[in-house]
Every structure is written in structure tokens, then in C-alpha cells.
């Protein structure tokens, strides 16, 4: 089953077979060993997935959660390929998929939303994929959220297994080819070591193929005949030629871990960092009394219809200068919101210091879930006021950064805010709107 001399055409055919979910008897993409020629390991087994495979072998109902950003969210991507492989490879086990992905978001939002999006559904295995979207965050910030994710999962159920999976974008390709994980994955590896969580770097194989000249990382398939084209945008794998590589790597190491079985509850050791976000809370606004200046969006509103599964309630100000006042004791306050054509500017005052926050960017020609944080605060009492002035600004100039033109000005006429929840590490002391 170990293919060493695959030419590009044969390799491409292999990828198509995986993507079409055929019985996985000959669907390897030359993932020869745990360590690539550069000496960079793509897999660390550590404690494996014993509880997951115990249930699989017994044919019991098994729930698999995929937790990450747009790379994992992709409809015809590694998520669906690996989940379909599980169903085919273990036909006597009923599998349920939990798709807990949100494009463009990292582990800093994930740790807050996971109670609703994952834990309420009682998963048996959670794949965690945030290496690309956590780019730019400090090691300490990644530790806070990623360690919080682990500890929340095991507090909810110590028999839930976790597997870290790492992806890559073009900006870290050379680093991986030089034999080093990107900084985000290096930080996550230290956490995985601490908690003995298995990890799979799907990007190591991609980097190897690119270095050997078999793969073009970013390009157009029609301009690169005879080669695998991984992506057209430097990040998101193509469903026919990029995602199957990711899927084949994960499949290989799931197979390698399947003999390590048994009911082995995971204990919680002393945390790596004391200020990790295991106490993070997603706070609902539904308990607030009615306000003349705020309203809950109706069920038929376009934003509610798009995001009701993860955001059951979404609120917006109805008058200019509507205000939200929050008092809390803690280190972090965030806002889980939706940004898009009708979103605008916020005036945020933290402990008397005022700042303008723009909830509109060059991608806001469509609506998407997002978040904004006030973090790194002292663990003390803080007061925050958010005012929504609804003043206009040049949205066309912002969209022009991506060569997007406003063809219907009415879609962008409002300058409001779509708020779903507060995100808090600490204790809420008071909350009101007026």
C-alpha cells in the first residue's frame, strides 16, 4: 500500500477516487511514513483515540464533530471525505456528523461558541482545525483559547477524544518545506503534548509534493497540465485536487490509530497557563427587558434565516445612538455578531477610553458571522459602553480593495449592528440597553 514512484497523472486519479468516496482499498496519496523526507513529522499519535474506536468497534452510535474555519467548512472538502470514509470503512457503526465550522474565525471565537455548537450534541470525537485562522495571534493568546477548548470538552465528557489537525496557507509553505511547522501549529503541538492529544499536519504532504515539483500550490488547473493544483487563492484547497490530499493523510492516520482501543477517561492536569479560557461564556441577550431602541430580528429576516442554527436570537438597534452598557469582572469581553452590507461603525468606550470600531470590511458584500474582542484586560471590574451612531461612511472605497462594486446602493444604506451574544471570560455584573 506504499506507493513511492507515482507520476502526477496517477496521483491525480488517486485523489479523484478519494473524493468520490470509493471503498478505501487503494486510495493512498503517497503518505509513506509519519516523517516526511525533510524530517518533519506529519503525525503524532500520543494517546490516540481509544474511546472513539472502542465505540466504533462495538458498532454503537458515534458522533464526530468538525470544529474549525472555512477550510473545514468546505462542502466537498476533507471533512465530508473523511466522514464518508468512516461510514464506508465501518459500515456497522451509525455515524452522525456535527458540522461546527465557521469560515474566517479562529479558536478565540470557537472556545465561546463550542458549548452551543458542539458540546450540547455530545460528540465522541472532535477534530480541531484552527492553525490557519489563528495566524497573527500570539502564542499566549492561542494557548488561552486552545487549552480552553480541550478543558471544556473534557469537563463535559472525559471520554470524548480530540484530534488536532493542521492545515496551511501559502504564506507558511516555505517554512514547512524547510522542516518546521508554522508558529500556530508549533504552539498547538505544545498543548497537544501536555494533554496527549494526537495531531495530524495535513499540510506536510502538500509541501512535499510542491517541493518535488508534482504540485503547484497556487494556480489554475488549466494552466498546469500534468500537475496537481492545490488552490487558486493561496489558502482554500480545490475540492478535486487539494482536499483529497488532506483527506488521505487524515484517513491514513485514523487507520493507524484504530487498534488503540478502550474506555480511557481523560483526566485534567494542571493547565499550561492559569488564564486559559475554560470558563468562557456565551451570554444571551434574551433576558434583557424590551427596549424602545433595540429589537429582536423576526424569523423571516435575511440575517436570521442565514444564521439561526448557530445564532437563535439576533438583535439590532432601531434608533441612532442606541446604547449597550456592560459591567463585568474579568479579562475578556467580546461580541458575537454578523457583519455585512448593512453593518456600520461602533463607538466603544472601555473604562472611560473611547474608540471607534468599524464592523464593515472589504468582504462585506455578503453577511457572515464574526466577533470583536476587548481582551488582555486586568482581572478586575470594567465598564463598557457601546453606542451605535448609524452614521454613514464610504463603503464603496472599502469594497474597492477587492474590486467589488456596489450595484444596489439600497443594500448598503443602513449602518447598523447585528448582535447575537456577548463573549465573556469572567463574571457579568450588569447589562442594560437604552
Residue ranges and their predicted role:
Residues 70-73, 102-108, 132-137, 160, ...:
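Solvent-exposed loop/turn segments at secondary-structure junctions
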Residues 44-53, 83, 107-120, 143-152, ...:
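Alpha-helical scaffolding within the catalytic cores
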Residues 161-166, 182-228, 244-257:
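Extracellular serine-dependent O-acyl
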Residues 65, 77-80, 93, 107-143:
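Oxyanion-hole/transition-state-stabilizing segment in secreted/luminal serine hydrolases
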Residues 74-108:
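Mobile, glycine- and charge-enriched loop segments
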Residues 1-67, 72, 77, 87-93, ...:
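N-terminal secretory targeting modules
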Residues 150-186:
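Active-site segments of SGNH/GDSL-like serine hydrolases
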Amino acid at each position: 500500500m506504499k506507493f513511492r514512484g507515482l507520476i502526477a497523472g496517477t496521483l491525480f486519479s488517486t485523489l479523484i477516487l478519494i473524493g468520490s468516496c470509493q471503498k478505501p482499498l487503494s486510495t493512498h496519496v503517497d503518505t509513506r511514513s509519519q516523517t516526511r523526507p525533510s524530517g518533519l513529522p506529519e503525525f503524532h499519535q500520543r494517546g490516540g483515540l481509544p474511546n472513539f474506536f472502542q465505540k466504533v468497534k462495538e458498532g454503537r452510535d458515534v458522533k464526530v464533530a468538525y470544529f474549525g474555519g472555512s477550510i473545514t467548512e468546505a462542502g466537498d472538502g476533507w471533512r465530508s471525505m473523511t466522514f464518508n470514509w468512516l461510514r464506508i470503512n465501518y459500515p456497522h457503526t451509525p455515524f452522525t456528523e456535527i458540522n461546527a465550522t465557521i469560515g474566517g474565525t479562529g479558536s478565540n471565537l470557537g472556545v465561546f461558541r463550542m458549548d452551543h455548537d458542539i458540546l450540547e450534541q455530545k460528540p465522541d470525537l472532535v477534530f480541531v482545525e484552527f492553525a490557519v485562522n489563528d495566524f497573527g495571534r500570539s502564542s499566549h493568546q492561542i494557548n488561552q483559547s486552545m487549552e480552553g477548548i480541550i478543558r471544556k470538552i473534557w469537563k463535559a465528557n472525559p471520554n470524548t477524544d480530540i484530534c488536532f489537525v493542521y492545515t496551511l496557507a501559502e504564506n507558511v509553505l516555505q517554512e514547512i518545506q524547510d522542516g518546521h511547522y508554522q508558529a500556530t501549529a508549533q504552539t498547538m503541538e505544545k498543548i497537544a503534548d501536555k494533554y496527549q492529544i494526537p495531531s495530524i499536519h495535513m499540510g506536510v504532504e502538500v509541501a512535499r509534493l510542491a517541493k518535488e515539483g508534482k504540485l503547484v500550490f497556487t494556480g489554475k488547473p488549466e494552466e498546469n497540465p500534468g500537475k496537481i493544483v492545490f488552490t487558486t487563492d493561496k489558502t482554500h484547497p480545490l475540492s478535486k485536487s487539494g482536499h483529497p490530499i488532506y483527506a488521505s493523510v487524515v484517513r491514513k492516520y485514523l487507520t493507524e490509530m484504530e487498534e488503540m482501543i478502550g474506555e480511557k477517561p481523560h483526566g485534567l492536569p494542571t493547565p499550561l497557563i492559569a488564564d486559559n479560557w475554560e470558563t468562557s461564556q456565551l451570554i444571551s441577550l434574551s433576558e434583557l427587558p424590551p427596549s424602545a431602541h433595540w429589537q429582536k430580528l423576526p424569523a423571516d429576516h435575511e440575517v436570521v434565516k442565514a444564521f439561526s442554527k448557530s445564532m437563535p436570537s439576533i438583535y439590532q438597534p432601531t434608533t441612532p445612538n442606541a446604547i449597550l452598557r456592560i459591567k463585568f469582572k474579568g479579562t475578556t469581553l467580546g461580541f458575537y455578531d454578523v457583519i455585512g452590507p448593512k453593518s456600520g461603525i461602533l463607538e466603544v468606550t472601555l473604562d472611560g477610553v473611547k474608540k471607534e470600531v468599524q464592523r464593515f470590511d472589504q468582504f462585506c458584500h455578503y453577511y457572515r458571522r464574526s466577533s470583536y474582542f476587548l481582551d488582555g484586560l486586568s482581572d478586575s471590574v470594567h465598564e463598557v459602553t457601546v453606542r451605535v451612531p448609524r452614521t454613514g461612511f464610504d463603503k464603496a472605497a472599502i469594497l474597492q480593495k477587492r474590486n467589488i462594486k456596489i450595484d444596489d446602493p439600497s443594500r448598503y444604506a443602513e449602518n447598523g449592528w447585528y448582535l447575537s451574544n456577548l463573549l465573556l471570560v469572567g463574571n457579568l455584573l450588569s447589562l442594560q440597553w437604552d
